[in-house]
């Protein structure tokens, strides 16, 4: 065995701890356990964490502005996709973006190349008129409202109701027909026309699917 100093006994350690001196001029202390170290770390205040989490009012205002800008940019891009699809894929003309204070988002309206919707009761009036006139009644296209949506969005009934409450049955520039007892079928292009919107649902790959939505109940079409 190598020669060296004799290790201190437990009694010597206790004596050295009491008088403040250590063996060979050094204070001998028992090692601190892992649990004690964790308790000491928990007792220390974590100033760095609190500083990183807390935000000044100016920073919060900036984050709010950025969030609003992102939402506006999303709506602009969504509207642009639908307008492009209507004009280039479905040959719509007179396509306009409609912005209104009480609308939750911009709407689109335009003129399709052919008429897209005929009310079931209007269909009956047209058949009667064709029998009386002994000729076909022309079905000219009408201006239609379009609401751009993304497939991932979740809209409630109240959201759609707010849109219907904010619009008129005919988009701006639509020709309204006055009441005429001799041409009841024409009233469906004016006073009898209900509010309807073409939902333009955009998917992630820019594919657009269209659905009709009516304000109120509409009975099924008769074949």
From Swiss-Prot:
Keyword Mitochondrion attributed: no
Q: Where is the composition biased (Low complexity)?
A: 30-55
In this chain, the stretch annotated as Disordered covers 1-55
Q: Give any Pfam family that matches.
A: Sen15
Task: Write down the InterPro entries for this protein, in alphabetical order.
Answer: Sen15_fungi, tRNA-endonuc_su_Sen15, tRNA_endonuc-like_dom_sf, tRNA_intron_Endo_cat-like_sf
This molecule's function is given as: Non-catalytic subunit of the tRNA-splicing endonuclease complex, a complex responsible for identification and cleavage of the splice sites in pre-tRNA. It cleaves pre-tRNA at the 5' and 3' splice sites to release the intron. The products are an intron and two tRNA half-molecules bearing 2',3' cyclic phosphate and 5'-OH termini. There are no conserved sequences at the splice sites, but the intron is invariably located at the same site in the gene, placing the splice sites an invariant distance from the constant structural features of the tRNA body.
Q: Which family is it part of? A: Belongs to the SEN15 family.
Stated name of the protein: Probable tRNA-splicing endonuclease subunit tsp-1
Q: Which organism is it from?
A: Neurospora crassa (strain ATCC 24698 / 74-OR23-1A / CBS 708.71 / DSM 1257 / FGSC 987)
